[in-house]
Amino acid sequence: MTAHRSVLLVVHTGRDEATETARRVEKVLGDNKIALRVLSAEAVDRGSLHLAPDDMRAMGVEIEVVDADQHAADGCELVLVLGGDGTFLRAAELARNASIPVLGVNLGRIGFLAEAEAEAIDAVLEHVVAQDYRVEDRLTLDVVVRQGGRIVNRGWALNEVSLEKGPRLGVLGVVVEIDGRPVSAFGCDGVLVSTPTGSTAYAFSAGGPVLWPDLEAILVVPNNAHALFGRPMVTSPEATIAIEIEADGHDALVFCDGRREMLIPAGSRLEVTRCVTSVKWARLDSAPFTDRLVRKFRLPVTGWRGK
């Protein structure tokens, strides 16, 4: 007896291309007896540019509408994403909770995290139906806020942890510590702690290097630091990075992947380590990361002759 198959579809709704691509996903999965699960916030009445469950059921698609909570992807084999990097990061959280792969199809601008572009959706669906994809484990970060030695908040990140000063506030005074030893104290707009996956995102814009995603490391990037030694550092993946906020300064904020926000009171401490739970990444493209880097950033390679 064939096991019941189900895919969670996460879509950046509200645009024609997303709806058209989602309709194609619905038809192909339905034709192949693969059930579809969609998020309640993306499932509204007919006539909108969102997903319409009643229309799908009328076409013979088995569909379930669920809330976007920690159990949204339970029982699914894959999370399929139609959107840009922001949508992918939202979907990655759901996939991580269920320990299943996430596969991105780009409908945004750069879409660095996506595995394919929208025009390749038929080829993508062939791989999904055949379960023909590789799965990579991507390093994630565990984030802890301590105040007076007590944990007051915690979170996680796939791309980066961004410590930032509050809006319209002065320079943020911090001390950066690695593996229990102080490295540098300075004033800044913030500090980024990034994974290799996130090195092409905010950390790159802040002056950090690009790290190949199969490299196991943690990247620390001061953001507009007023310091002689305010340079990016690449640490061991097993390092503990701590950032202490000056006690006589002001509160700060931490953003995990630009989505989950935490308050960092003055005098408290932010600790970032490798998380034991990774994000499972479905890969279709066998091309090296170098090709993706050149393609997504449109890097000039004219004149290259090779061997």
UniProtKB/Swiss-Prot annotation:
GO cellular component annotations of the record: cytoplasm
E.C. code: 2.7.1.23
Cofactor(s) recorded in Swiss-Prot or TrEMBL: a divalent metal cation
Binding site for ATP: D189
Family in the record: Belongs to the NAD kinase family.
Variant or mutagenesis effect after changing G208A: Possesses 30% of the activity compared to the wild-type enzyme. While mutant affects the catalytic efficiency, it does not alter the binding affinity for ATP and poly(P)
Catalysed conversion reaction: NAD(+) + ATP = ADP + NADP(+) + H(+)
PANTHER family per the UniProt record, alphabetical: NAD KINASE (PTHR20275:SF0)
UniProt name for this protein: NAD kinase
Temperature dependence: Optimum temperature is 50 degrees Celsius.
Function field: Involved in the regulation of the intracellular balance of NAD and NADP, and is a key enzyme in the biosynthesis of NADP. Catalyzes specifically the phosphorylation on 2'-hydroxyl of the adenosine moiety of NAD to yield NADP. It can use ATP and other nucleoside triphosphates as well as inorganic polyphosphate (poly(P)) as a source of phosphorus.
Database matches in SUPFAM superfamilies: NAD kinase/diacylglycerol kinase-like
Activity regulation summary: Allosterically inhibited by NADP, NADPH, and NADH, at concentrations lower than 0.5 mM. Completely inhibited by p-chloromercuribenzoate.
UniProt source species: Mycobacterium tuberculosis (strain ATCC 25618 / H37Rv)
Enzyme class: transferase
Variant or mutagenesis effect after changing D85A: Abolishes catalytic activity
Keyword tags: ATP-binding, Cytoplasm, Kinase, NAD, NADP, Nucleotide-binding, Transferase
Compartments in which it is found: Cytoplasm
Upper lineage: Bacteria, Bacillati, Actinomycetota, Actinomycetes, Mycobacteriales
Note: Was identified as a high-confidence drug target.
pH dependence: Optimum pH is 6.5 in sodium-acetate at 50 degrees Celsius for poly(P)-dependent kinase activity and optimum pH is 8 in Tris-HCl at 50 degrees Celsius for ATP-dependent kinase activity.
Organism domain of life: Bacteria
Substitution effect: E160A: Abolishes catalytic activity
Disulfide bond keyword on record: no
